[in-house]
């Protein structure tokens, strides 16, 4: 259901996101990112091909939902989602990464009507499933090493002042400095405690309750797209009578073939190693890199870490008409308004647009910015000049004034 919902949300912008007529043609993607995974979406840039692959992914997700040939359906979802996500990686959030990684482990778990013995067997897949979920919270906590998290406890002040994500409730909560300090300490404490509570069966229910409270609180304060629903759905796999995580006592022997068990134990070692390597900035040996690329298990979880970041702002696509008037192409042709928006939500039609635009500013790829400007100007015959502007409103320390600063990312003149 989670995959189907995510696919449905993309339908209005399928051509803009994934076709060669959209914001990231295949040639442009290959110029800014190395290809690391066999990709069906790169075979054609037509909207028809993209739609067919979208339908195939939805079919595999529906088969998985109905329990029909679950293992094959899960493998198809894993492969097709990797293909889709690679086609435009600037659209993704942490929830998409968790979804793909958990699908890998689910391919080796009894998702359909297996016998109770098989469901409760001791398997490296159950170990990997639990380890994967726990590592997300553990390394997200470890990454938060900046003093604003550990000593000053002002991190959530910076997080909730990122208006691209902040909800109306966040605008109200961030006004209290005391609340910010308490919530910062509480958030960090939850991220540290959840992975350990989930690991042992005696404390797992407490861990799941805290995980639920943690993510519902995040959803109330921040618009983070697939992150919250994905985390909650993946946590269902830790409930009793679902694919069960390992205990300290050995269970029924696993029925997976020996080579598969060896592969899964290697994958368990890899996901732990790569999280440490990313955190410590280690040089990863080529054989280890190759293993991660083949099975697409590379990951890192620096969510609002080590510092939550101060960058904030909004986009303006200024189009100057031939009569000299200026309009904002991103706001449907309204007059250009340089004032700070009262509500940032309408500036981002969806979470994928939010991710795309923020990555556009963070990565500063001139060719991508130029392509986006040209795409935004398509069909406009009345323009003389256009420019893509990011109004950077860097969040100052508490008590200091905000100073918006326009930055031009791309511009274009049109011939008469």
Briefly describe each language-model feature range.
Residues 1-416:
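Alpha-helical membrane-anchoring segments
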